[in-house]
Structure formats: structure tokens, C-alpha cells
Amino acid sequence: MHGTMAAPAAGSAVSRADVNEARGLVELAGQAATGLVGTVRDMHRAIAGRPFWALSLAGKPFGPVGAASTVPARFLHDHISSAVYKGLRSAGSGVASAGGAAAASLTRQDARLLTRRPAGALAAGVLNGFLGDLLEESGNDLLTQIGFHDGPHQLELERRALGEALPAATPRIAVFVHGLCGTEATWRVNWWGTRDAVDYGQRLRSDLGYTPLYVRYSTGLHVSEAARALSELLERTVAEWPVEVGEIALFGHSMGGLVSRGACYRAAAEGSTWVEKVRHVFCLGTPHLGAPLEKAANVAGWTLSALPETRPFGAIVNRRSAGIKDLRYGYCCAEDWRDCDPDALLECHRRDIPFLETASYYFLGATITRDSQRPLGRLIGDLLVRPSSAWGQGLGGRHYPFEIERLRTYGGMHHMHLLNHPAVYEQLRGWLSGDPRELPAAA
């Protein structure tokens, strides 16, 4: 797909011609300012409440009059401070409204401040990772809509447009689903610095005849919501593909592995056509049993929320997106999180969802230690995901029914190296070509 995708037609459903990222930035800045004022206000009230409470307690021995002696002072304090904070919030909202009106007058090109440039698109990916659910709730134009991308161009899912954009489309499709805070570009970033990154999709095109498609989506939404959107996207893709689709291989990095598994689960339950074509599901560094960093954030948010003085900080920590919170225990479907408190202390509601009977699954992990069996490597894994979670083989937890040949751990790598490392590609190609050999660089 790289270098061959045509720009989407203006006004088409996928081009989102009405998107105004400048307006979205202004609106988000206004929300941030309002939220900051609210946080300061809550801290002020919590801290000020302590001395008022202490003075009231000290006055109790003198009867009702003594206990109520602080009421006038507190009444005056609360009303003055409320008026000040209300004024600050109104000022912030006014500035945001004025900025939004100015942004609305920009041309379509000028309005796309972020995604028209590669670095900006990556920044938008990070923003969506942390605030995707907030962007959706507020209808913000910065919310990334799911689609197949190649740089600034989005693939239009209509048969004629697909034929023009992908004249060499084949019956074999390789779908790449990025992880948290990423975009399709993360598959091509040279994470090794001095080494050449391997574009798995382009190599699979030349080596095995796959047509690569790179997904871009908002990673701040629930994994189950991204999975639903991916399922719908693939259903349209199969229906409009220029040739009859014979095989689909899914490649998910980190959160992308959960999204891929969730999409297959939902599609199978709904009887979607596309899932019948899936033959391979690859999960690279996917936290099937959860990520320790998100567990730590959960503990921090819960602890900070325990006291009035630190509760505003707890609210900030707990403002993490729904997508991030799903990584705590590897949630894939809505039943995992629906009707549950997302900020409850280390409560796991994950369900075991079935694999596709028609597909082979492959789980790959990494450790920063060259020997993946060393205690340090097993403890911290690739810095974000432990090998036990990447394999779905936790102690006392679920154990996926894998043949050992479908599980690999790479030593001397961090989380992002799995995106385009030569040794990883050789293993992927070997599995897809039916080569049973165990290839180098695995422990």
C-alpha cells in the first residue's frame, strides 16, 4: 500500500471534509483550562476545610454557639472563592469560544493543523491515546476516526476507489493494528537507531503476495469499541475489495493485539463475513493478562483519592482514557468493563473469549535482558509488558492452548522493537509460509 494509495475524494464519507482540527485544539485548551481551575478549586476547598473543621470542633465544648462560631467566616470564604473560580471558568470558556469562532473560518487545509504532517499525526495519536474517550464525549474534531492510512491519505472503501488506489491488490490481506498512542507510522519508525527498520507489510507483499493495510484508530476509546469499529471496517473492506478475498492475517502490536482479538470475537458472534477469511492472528507484545504500569497507575489514583487534600490529584490520575484502563487486565470485550467501577482498586473482570477455530494464533514477547529467562527479564519484560502476559501464561491465571512453536520471546529488545525488527519479521514470514523451523534470536 505504501506509495500507491490515492488521496480520498473530497466530500466522501471517509475524508471528513468538515473536520477542523484547529477548532478541536481550541476546544481542548478551553476544557483543559476549565479542568485546571476546577482542580485548584477542589484543592483549595479541601485544604481550607481542615482549619474550619478544627475550629468548629474546638468550639463544641462551649455549646452550639461555640460550634457554630465558624459558620459566618466559612460562608463568606466559600462564596467569595466560588465567585472567583466561576469567573475564571467563564473567562476560559469565553477565550475558547472566541478561538473556536476564529478557527471555524480557516480553510480546510489550514484547519488540519496536525494530521497533514507526519509529526502532527503522531502527536494526534498520542493525544487520542490519553484523551480519546473525552474527545468522543465532547464531539471534538481531534478524535481519530478509524480507517486505513498511508501518511496523510486515507483509503476510500469503495470498489472503484480501491481498484485505483491498489491496482495490485491480491486475495491475501495483511492488516496491521498499532498500539496505544500510535498511528500506522509506528510500524515504520526506526526504533533501532543504527539499524534499518523492516516494514513487515511491504516485505510480506514482496515475499508472500500479501496486500498490506495499515489501520489508524483512537486508542483512548475502550478496546471493545475500537474492536467493533475494526470489525465494521473489515466487513466493508471485504465487500468492496477489487478481487475476492481468500485470506486475512491480523498483526496487532500491544493494544492492537487486544483490538484484533476483540474484533474477531465480536465478528464471530455477529456472523460477519470478514472473520471467515481470517487465518492468522499475530499479537506482538500484547498484554493479554494486563500491564504492570497501568496497575500501578490504578493504585496511585486510588490512593490519592483517599484523602480530601489529594483527591484532586487522584482525579487527574484517574482521568486516564478508557483505552489505557483496559490495559490493566487485558480487556477485549464490553462485558469486561460494563457496569464496573473503572477506578476500583485492582479488580479484574476479564473474561476468557474464545479463539477463532479457523485461525492460528501467535503470541510474541520480548525482554530487555538478552537472556529472556533471567529473573530481571521475566520481571520487567520489554519495559511495558512481561513475557507471562505477552504469552497469556500467568500463574494462577488463564493459559492459552498453544503449541509451543507459536510462542516466542526475544531477548535484548524493548516494547517498540517488536514493530519492525528483522528477526521478528523472519519468524513471521516463516510461520506464514508454513516453515516450521525455529528461527534465531528467540529464547
What are these regions (language model features)?
Residues 119-124, 128, 265-443:
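Helical cap/lid subdomain of alpha/beta-hydrolase-fold lipid enzymes
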